[in-house]
UniProtKB/Swiss-Prot annotation:
GO MF, one example: BMP binding
UniProt feature, compositional bias: Low complexity: 140-160
Record flagged with keyword Glycoprotein: no
Disulfide bonds: C34-C84, C48-C98, C58-C117, C62-C119, C81-C122
Self-association state and partner proteins as the record states: Homodimer.
Gene Ontology CC annotations of this record: extracellular space
Location in or out of the cell: Secreted
Stretches for region Disordered: 132-178
Originating species: Mus musculus (Mouse)
Domain CTCK as annotated: residue spans: 34-123
Protein name as it appears in the record: Neuroblastoma suppressor of tumorigenicity 1
Protein role: Possible candidate as a tumor suppressor gene of neuroblastoma. May play an important role in preventing cells from entering the final stage (G1/S) of the transformation process.
Organism classification: Eukaryota, Metazoa, Chordata, Craniata, Vertebrata
Gene: Nbl1
Length: 178
C-alpha cells in the first residue's frame, strides 16, 4: 500500500513547479519584484461601442537563467524561468452597447480583473477555479446571468453572443493603456 502511495505522489512532486527565486548568488544586490499597477483598459467588440474600465496589469522583474549544457549530458539541464503574472484575479462581466444591431443590441464580455501579482513559474497555467464564485455583473451583482452559448430568448430581447471560455485568447480586445 505504501509503494502505491509513493508511486502516485512522487511523480506529482517531481513535476511541481519550483518555488520562485528572489535572489541569485551572481547578483546578491538584486532582488526579484512583481506588483499590480493600475491601468485603464479598453474593452471592445466588433460593431459595439468600446468601454474604458479600471484594471491592473502585472509588472516586474523576475529571475530566469540558463546554464550551458554538455553533450553527452552528465546532469540535468539547469534552466529556470519565473514571470510576473496574476496570483489572484476575479472575473467581471462588462456589457457593451451595439447600436444598430437589433438582433444583438449588447454583448457581454468576461474580463479578468487582477487583484494581486507575483513571480511564478513561466509555464504555469492560470487557475480559473472558483470562476462562478467571482463573476459579478456590472450593473447589479446577481441580476444578470453570465455569458453562455445556447439558444433561447433573454429578457428584453437580449441574446448574448457565444463567448470563448476564460483563458482563450481574446482577439477582439483593443488593448490596455496607462
Amino acid at each position: 500500500m505504501l509503494w502505491v502511495l509513493v508511486g502516485a505522489v512522487l511523480p506529482v512532486m517531481l513535476l511541481a513547479a519550483p518555488p520562485p527565486i528572489n535572489k541569485l548568488a551572481l547578483f546578491p544586490d538584486k532582488s526579484a519584484w512583481c506588483e499590480a499597477k493600475n491601468i485603464t483598459q479598453i474593452v471592445g467588440h466588433s460593431g459595439c461601442e468600446a468601454k474604458s474600465i479600471q484594471n491592473r496589469a502585472c509588472l516586474g522583474q523576475c529571475f530566469s537563467y540558463s546554464v550551458p549544457n554538455t553533450f553527452p549530458q552528465s546532469t540535468e539541464s539547469l534552466v529556470h524561468c519565473d514571470s510576473c503574472m496574476p496570483a489572484q484575479s476575479m472575473w467581471e462581466i462588462v456589457t457593451l452597447e451595439c447600436p444598430g444591431h437589433e438582433e444583438v443590441p449588447r454583448v457581454d464580455k468576461l474580463v479578468e480583473k487582477i487583484v494581486h501579482c507575483s513571480c511564478q513559474a513561466c509555464g504555469k497555467e492560470p487557475s480559473h477555479e472558483g470562476l462562478n464564485v467571482y463573476v459579478q455583473g456590472e450593473d447589479s451583482p446577481g441580476s444578470q446571468p453570465g455569458p453562455h452559448s445556447h439558444a433561447h430568448p433573454h429578457p428584453g430581447g437580449q441574446t448574448p453572443e457565444p463567448e470563448e471560455p476564460p483563458g482563450a485568447p481574446q482577439v477582439e480586445e483593443e488593448g490596455a493603456e496607462d
